[in-house]
Amino acid sequence: MKKQLKSFAFAVLASAVITSCADSASINQQAASSYTQEMGKIRSQGAIDTTSNTARRIHHVFNKMVPYANQANETGLEFNWQINVIKSKELNAWAMPGGKMAFYTGLVD
């Protein structure tokens, strides 16, 4: 009886882990698609900043943080980290599942 209970508990736990991994992968994929679409709109408006000192500084800090974020990632999935700097006086930044981020220059300037 105990052996059957342990086997059942293991099966339930394993299926929960497998299901959550599949869900995380789907969520990350949907987020990546939405991120690409949103960045395309912003890029078409000429609002992506890749060359200013602010953008370079944000990317520098971001690149230093990624290894620590990878260590803390407990999803079992690798993230494809991306950040885009948006030229705007707005005080804003946002992140999406799977390591997609946007940072507005207004937070730094």
Predicted regions and their residues:
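C-terminal motif of bacterial Sec signal peptides marking the signal peptidase cleavage site
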Residues: 16-20
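Peri-catalytic and regulatory segments of divalent metal-dependent proteins
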Residues: 22-109
